């Protein structure tokens, strides 16, 4: 109570956590005493509320010395300490030394006092609510905070010899942090580690993806048992970078500290993905009449969001932002034509006051946009706000998804669009559904992993005050999903803070239906909170709305409601995954002034002069409109509030709410609990007895001085917190409630109350002042009947169903009236109200205030609904305005029987006793503890779901809080299921002990160095979200673990025979890998007393999780938990690890009930480019723990034979990249040196081969195999045998189907040495003729007919295969370089020649033919990539993968292959073709990590250089940062060869909505349908023929080529139906063919109907931005300048997101040669283009009928061969013959008219000699089959 006065200034310290007075230091203790007593405290784990500040430790022996400052040239050590100069201190190596500047005594005392006093208030407020102070030392004034710590190391001898007088020296960086100057005097002393151990350390990182296992390893390697300081840079494995942002010791920020085994690291990401939800509820359009007059949305767009974005910019954060506007719209049934048979496909029928159906709307404003473009984001937000209300309010009756009255669809002319909806209140909004939607994509977080951003944060901005009415199913499902996915939510409220605990979710738990119910029909009917009852809370007044418009059952109940009834009592829960903030622009402005040290700024938490006599806290719009100051004044009484205090109302007639029934403004200043605001009967007698007239009260308040106010508050506190002796005697089975907590302060809120509420207040006032002092017994049973108010003279505790003042009853005794339904602009429908009549009932739907928890049921404390009796016999939709009286401390004085101003005792809530003996005894909390419920009751939840009917005897139970109890509690299965995530509490009187309980924050408890304050904005979380902590203390009790969990044990041991895979060698390594795997999947290591008590191992309480040696001992136990799953790892004898999985029973038993009614969610969604809202069916099932941990652990241990597709079975992290061919310019060829004769296509293939060479060099080889491999290294061959074809894979497979029934092992593996050792050749003893015979013989190199584009080359071999042959069969050739050199010698001697005589011999995909003089006649040429085999052999399942054909026949169904899993077996009648291959790749060749870092690298085996080359990476437990480094090096290499490495989604574009609900492809249709396409040419190496049907998408493909799209993946239907095509990563399941723009920013698919589906590639910007920022470290130092300027792989996007909107523009404008067609397509493809620019130009073209007709006419029928684009014609072109083979052979197969037709139609053939082939001609390339060597060769 000591700080009550200072706390009066602002409501921002009104918290649901320990208040600041519990954290401050007693002022009575002198700084000297504090400083000296510090030595006596040795407890490392100091509690936040301890009263002493420990500043130093250990010894008082101090030495004064001179401190030097040195630079790196002097020494690289941060601190040099001459141990010999401090021999008197007995300093040893390894001791911790404290450096403190010498200060004058006055300075020390002054700084200490400032810390003990104002520091705890002012600075802590500034840290959480404002920007950093200009002076960095302003926050670190005390010795504890500003001291410099270091560990003693030996001084180098050379420095000691050169500088014998050196005592201590620090670097400039350290001196700047601690404020040291050269030659300054400092005090040196030895301190104990325990006194300088940090409790929490904030570690920030950005631009990298870190899994939590990497964080664990980083701490073990770089931080554990070391001294750390603020601003310290951390580098782990030379790649992972982080910065120490804050260090906390006992809740205070310090500059340095010791990272002890018990220090908790808190990692915060500065490059996260933010999803901002803005709840566009009804209140968002309310005007702030007492403030600026703006609507609440202005607070978002002009206040909160700009401030948030500015803070992001100031901290250099690189977040991706998605903003979604959402609301729930209620429709007027009368406007729709009466009651409608609403189906799930139309509108959901949710019970509301008028039984209105509802629909949820979501409008995506921006998606994954870089936070740096915040001005653009705000502009878009403003534009969408203008039309949002219009769009969601208009109901189009002609929509097929909107039913009519008779259920049939009618024409638009009969049913035009009508305005039939209005947004619901924030209280009843769809907040949980929105959060669940945002987190849904995290279930697929392992797919398409972004390697730049870490963490996902969801911010929900609501105009409400943090109270929401939800359904049990949605709360449970959302909580479970968030708990499993390890993310938390930030809730930002625009309304003032209520007077109770927040954030608050009120729900009704399902109960079993019974045949008979004591609750009547209404109870037996039941309803879920989805069936919104007549409880229409508004969002801003902490009052109850006892509106009983519904009795009995009602129509429209779903199957779920018929199966399971709802409990009649409200439950109240605070989820640990939701962090709440309150945005107050005025308070923020004050905080900014304080931060800027404005001398006129108010001092926080001090009493200042009141600026107004009366500041209304409830806005009553209707009252303002009806002349309240005139005739209505005598009938209407406005509750008089103070600092956010709620409306006060009488609890009986004697208090009448007339002019004499108002309370003073100063009534509940500090210690008012929420329920204290609800009834004047609870106000202290000394104050209530003096109230005569509200106007007098107002004037009296104006005259009060602050001292008088404080005196009154003290008087009130003394009255409130007296022992409840008399009350306890009058209660049954109850005990006194704890006093209201001081930190729950009154909110400085402008609360709002609608006219309906005031009218009912007036009505009740009329009834209550009629002279009848007693309430008649109601004749109609009401749900809330047991909420009783003592009657007049003698309050009777056994009164049966006493009438409540605020209870609206449909009784005949009540004067009939109609409440006004139009309270402000958006409440635009309803019956026209008669003249308003006052009533004490407050309709919370319109009373816009902090909707509190206790509003609807007496169970308003977060008590278990089964524990406290509901008010049987009263309407459950109604509640007394004094319900909460039972939750409030009772008045200490007996209630006089005559005085009208005498307050009665609080109303109690009856709870039926379990046994008759318990009726007269209070319930002992220690006997019936409840860990999650604040209700202490002896009444268990009965099996039939009903309660004992003894509640009719009157309420006799009072709520208590027991959040901290560890004993098992009596809870229903429903509450047990919810308990881990949502804590049930009493919101109106939450115990301080409960709020201080660290387990209050659940899995996030270790993320808080000190208790957070509710009322302030959590800028730290909003700027850089915390990653889920590595440790937790949350653990079930022994009883719960034994009874509520299923156990599954198994054992794991390392595989002794790994067979070439990376496996842990010892049990310790295996244990670390198993823990790392669980940490990366969201598990937390459990520590603390709870797990130690349950397991019986005290060592677990202080487990050092950063010391793996202690974890690897025999018998060592580690517990890890995630949601409802607990894993126990025990090291047992024999080198094994025993794993026991504990799975909660209710998670499976209740799952069915939750999914039945809530799984299918049908909101109306409008994505970025959509023109209207469309319904989407979304399943919101919670993620079940279906991960097979037994398989995963054994896979880690090396037992992998039982898994045929581990990447999918074990949910590997997966990413996919494509290499996109880009056009090369002339100046880009300079660095290619000798390859200037290569054309563009050859250079691209050369780049792919260069990458394969890197992959081969860094492929993973187990250590045991390296010994054997080193001897054979000279004979090693590149295993990445990629086959290059100029047709698409489906065409190759179709054309070669007759020849690929058998696969050639040589294509996949290095061919065995063909010649025996004795027959190996030597270069010196071989003749050309004999060598020619051997080469063309059976043991020679493979000769076959090969086609390249339109040219056929007979009996040729490939340079890369011939190089391998020479290396394997020549004894004196030891390397591929020597083989190439020998091949050139053979070529010079005329043994063979290039098919087009353009190249010398190269190790690549170059075609060569034996010269005619050495050629051996062959009866039949091998015209396939595969050798002719005998047909009686079986086809291996891993067979030929590169066999093509032009198959444009889309005859067979797609669906049968879409869902088929990849299996190693093949169909009996189908050939199996594998089109990709996998290799183990080592991403850590420099061995920076202490473990193998291996990934699975999948690459194409069959590639068309005109298309994308596919790369897919998958890994299980590898460090992602090392993977990113490897990818960046690949990108740098590929860029040199004109290839752009781009990350793309794994799934096809049309399936994006399955994993990301806020995204949808954009459809573009052709204005003019294209004519039938040409008949495709099905050709192979022997024939050309016109077969099959025409390609109906021929013109679509041509149009995509025109706009620089290249083929990514073909549709599954494009492959022959009799061939089973698969990839090493799985079966292709693309429904439509997919193309990608050369910029990588846009994907497009062609549907069967001929439409285009466009989708922006969100992954390209993050990938390339990172490549630009980090690429300089990876092979960029040797890049020519002209390459660095290219807008290719490494050009930055400046955080531009490729989202589809006209918001992003290209950064660079680099010119390029104009294509011969005259189109700037190639120019645009060379620079990054935001996808909307490409889309706009493409859509404009498709909508132009004339241009389309012209395009169709000039596009002649010809076989399509997509090209990269034109390249300059080289000098050598004219000297290359068209074909080497004789004309007689060529003319038989190649028709010359096709050449002419193709060239003329294309229009891009330059006018050159016929022998010259331009690169841009898709028919005839100037090059021959080519691929280039593995690395640049200097060939003369």
UniProtKB/Swiss-Prot annotation:
Residues 36-51, 749-766 have a biased composition (Basic and acidic residues). One of its GO terms (cellular component) is vacuolar membrane. It is a peripheral membrane protein. It comes from the Eukaryota. Keywords: Membrane, Vacuole. It is found in: Vacuole membrane. The keyword Disulfide bond does not apply. The gene is iml1. Residues 16-31, 962-975 have a biased composition (Polar residues). Residues 1-12, 727-737 have a biased composition (Basic residues). Residues 794-813 have a biased composition (Low complexity). Belongs to the IML1 family. Pfam families: DEP, DEPDC5_CTD, IML1, IML1_N_fung. GO terms for molecular function: GTPase activator activity. PANTHER family: DEP DOMAIN CONTAINING PROTEIN 5, GATOR COMPLEX PROTEIN DEPDC5. Residues 1-51, 727-816, 886-975, 1421-1471, 1814-1836 are annotated as: Disordered. The keyword Membrane applies. CDD domains: DEP_DEPDC5-like (cd04449). Its main location: membrane. Residues 1337-1412 form the DEP domain. This is Vacuolar membrane-associated protein iml1. One of its GO terms (biological process) is intracellular signal transduction.
